[in-house]
Amino acid sequence: GGRFANLLGWDGWAAYKPYALLWVAVTAVVTFTLWSIVVRRRLALLAALATTLAGMLHGVDEPYAWPSAAWLAPVAVLAWQALRREEGTPRWTLACVGCYVGFAAITYTLHFGFAVLLVLVMAAVLGVFRVHSGRKVWPTVKQLFFRLLPIGLVSLAVALLVWTPYLVQTKLLLDSPKNAAMHYLPQEGATFPLPMTETNALGVLCMAGVVWLLLRFRRNEIAAALLVLVTAIYCWYVLSTLALVAKTTLLAFRLNVILDGALAAAGVFALLELIGFLRERIDARHALQVTTVALAVGLIGAVSMNQTAISEKLQPAKEQAYSDYYPTGDNAKGAKDPKEPGHWAPAVYAAVGQLTGKDPQENILLTTDYKLMSFKPYWGFQQETPHYANPLGEYDQRADEIKRWAAAKTPQQLLDMLNSSRFAPPNVFVLKHPDNASGQQSGQQGQSGDGGKLQLTLKGDAFPQSPNVRDYDVAFDPAVFQSPQFAQREVGPYTVIVRR
């Protein structure tokens, strides 16, 4: 996304919407291409359409994660066919599966881990069936190994394009730091997903898919592959539940969109087989009527899925989009409420620019009002939560450093702490008044008039509690900034402090 914005010369926040929509479109085209490899193009078009409708909101909300989710179902079918084939498998098939696994590794690590497990499970299932049918163990293992080897090599080559610096820094993961990313268990992750029980068009389509998978998996390769995929997702949920014993999860709910797409595609195949069955059993004079009814029902279902997604599931995001403030200090409705911190964003940006005399990308900010960071390319000293922090960023150590700075009693003591920090220290502090004095006018010089301390709100990992983060305040004595080494300005609820 960042490279897309750079290419267009846009700010990241402005490029997000077209970037997300572009990924949804590209993902749909590639999904169709992948399905067309394993089924006829007409079927592939319908399967890709069902997948897109089932997961479109995920694509808009998390465009970086949508491709690997949408493509997994057809890739799973390709992998199953490649592993199941008795004669030599075309190299391009193995390379295609490997490219997908590598792509998942550089875009969404959870999907990468699940895809690796899925391919290994498929190989194990096929190996067990072959040995059970009388094949010798060693030749079976050898054949499957040499099918898996190209997949692994290609995926490794693709993944290393992005992962090499991290692997070098962590000594091939032997020195990997603690990571809180897996410490999250929302309500949807605490229960098994049952999309086939929903009382809408997607629920009907998924139920048809479940029935088709159970009836056809013995005689249809596509049904067998998708059934293994669906079963693996539920097994991942079981493993994620067991992981709670170790006070972590496997973020199983992130696989729900894959489940929806796979069952929706299976539902398309089920309905098409049902239509074909009816056309063969009824009088030829009524065959056209059956096709017409099927097309009408399919169109109504597609429109229903689309409208449900836009009108219901997207409603909270739409409300937030209307209320969020732009970098101009107003929101989509034109509101300019001084009680809202976002109203003061332009004044904060102006204060930082005037006091530092530097471009945004030359400044390191210490603030926990992260919406200020959304519109300007400042460097941030601290990430918003430990769950989204780069493991190499040492979130906890940075939080301890901030608390150490807040304990300073004099300006010189604070300066000495900043100079001796093992991290690149911030040159800009954007702190909040304790009374959140949003009614003050920008441009006023000096410190907070009531002499109260200036605050930051930090977050810590609270898993397995819900919510999984805890907020705590860190307060700076305004006196530690009373030095010629600092310049400061009050802007609404903020005090902007710049180190000269």
Predicted regions and their residues:
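Short hydrophobic/aromatic helix or loop-helix immediately within or flanking a transmembrane segment
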Residues: 1-12
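Membrane-helix boundary/interfacial segments in multi-pass membrane proteins
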Residues: 9, 58-67, 108, 173-197, ...
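Membrane-embedded helix bundles of polyisoprenyl
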Residues: 20-127
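Aromatic-anchored segments of alpha-helical transmembrane domains
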Residues: 51-56, 101-105, 155-162, 229-242, ...
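Transmembrane catalytic cores of multi-pass membrane glycosyltransferases
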Residues: 58-68, 93, 103-228
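Membrane-interface junctions at the ends of membrane-embedded or membrane-associated helices
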Residues: 80-93, 125-143, 264-288
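Signature aromatic-anchored transmembrane alpha helix within multi-pass, membrane-resident enzymes
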Residues: 156, 275-316
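Short periplasmic/luminal acceptor-recognition loop of GT-C membrane glycosyltransferases, typified by
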Residues: 301-406, 418-472, 476, 480-499
